[in-house]
Amino acid sequence: RRGALSETPLAELIPDAVDEVGGPTILATFTVIAALLPMAFVSGLMGPYMSPIPINASMGMLISLAIAFIVTPWLALKLLKPQGAGHGEEQGETRALRLFRGVIGPFLGGAKGGAARMTLYTGILVLILGAVSLAGLKLVVLKMLPFDNKSELQIVVDMPTGTPLEHTSGVLQEMGSYLATVAEVTDYQAYAGTSAPINFNGLVRQYSLRQSPELGDIQVNLADKHQRSRQSHEIALAVRPPLEAIARHHGASLKVVEVPPGPPVQAPIVAEVYGPDYAGQIAVAQKLRADFIAAPDIVDVDASIDEAAPKLRLRVDRAKAALMGVAQGDIVAAIRIGLAGEDVTPLHESGAKYEVPVRVSLPPEQASRVESLLRLKVRAAGGNLIPLSELVFAEKLAREQTVYHKDLLPVVYVVGDMAGKLDSPLYGMFEIRSRIMGKPLAQGGSLGEYFISQPDDAYAGYAIKWDGEWQVTYETFRDMGLAYGVGLILIYLLVVAQFKSYLVPLIIMAPIPLT
């Protein structure tokens, strides 16, 4: 523009042109930085995912500012051709002015444009309400983070309590045989009686505690995402029904666990049950679990409730053992050998690279029967061999319930996932909520509900606190809202410094709530 209106050499025009736009450019740069920088202070597990955004964006804006003041003027000097003074823009300005008057004119003119302005405001309000209602009408799925396309899945299997390790391994092999038929699966590894190698997701879900014969994991590796047409989430949805059929046949429960795109949670949908009595909490959780199962599209339902199972306790008759001259340590050692075995000596082989232990134990089919165990003999002080059945008696008990705690409060967890048309845990959470709230409890009263924090008095009555992906969503939007509030204050101060006015920045920033 300056070149077209003046015959001054381009090298002399460029500094004035840069000075003309320099102030607004600097203001815009630091305004963007002020808007993004508070995101670096988002707390919780979402913080590490958010912090690169303000850092990288701020660096990009500063680099962009340097390019605007250094590189762009130099390129303009090298590439632009000198132009003589003229009035080439008058016609363009006339067309632009005509367009401006045609669009803006009806809204100006004081009282004359009042009806048009009211129509504009009403239209904007209707559009805002329509946009907000899209999530409520389920035309747009409200979800914290989209599904990622990872190259792995994890199958978590829980067999009935007391299932032998061999049976668990057999079920995993049956599932593995099916997984081998899936085109996108390159390989898999089954782990019976223990957990797969712990990843970040497993660390939060405490998979390291999965050490029992009835527990199993299958680590499934998929082809590279560039070598397959289906997303990993689509594959997970496709393999779940056949795997669930195998699990139901063996009385097992199954979870298809995907690597989350953001911070991991215990489960996408988590209900924490609090109350004055743990037995009552378990009863409430069992009813809640039934509501989870009955809700449409809710899968992978589980609860932190141990199955009722018998337990056998072996007690030593101390008086009789002392009378026969048998040490209690010898009795315990014999029982340990029968149940778990013991390495008694290494096998000496000249060609062996590592020590080969010689293990003494009962055959597996006998180790599982207490009668076989009690037929083992220990040597008394006089040299006689005495069977354990004369010194040990078995007590049949019920298995104790594991008591979980969170922030020192006893809690029972009920968890689930969403897999259906909506595929967002928030919709599943509110579907379950509509089924349980307002109904009387068998223990008396109604169930309390908390979304943000635990009950102030967890022993006053039974209540649930929603957790999982909802908690991450709430904390993220809470922190981001506070961060953008600070950002707006910084933007306001920058604009005040630019225009030397406290009112003009408010007018300039008025459209921000509409974005």
Range-by-range predicted roles:
Residues 10, 14, 46-49, 53, ...:
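Hydrophobic alpha-helical segments of integral membrane proteins
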Residues 37, 41-45, 347, 378, ...:
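Interfacial segments of transmembrane alpha-helices in multi-pass membrane proteins
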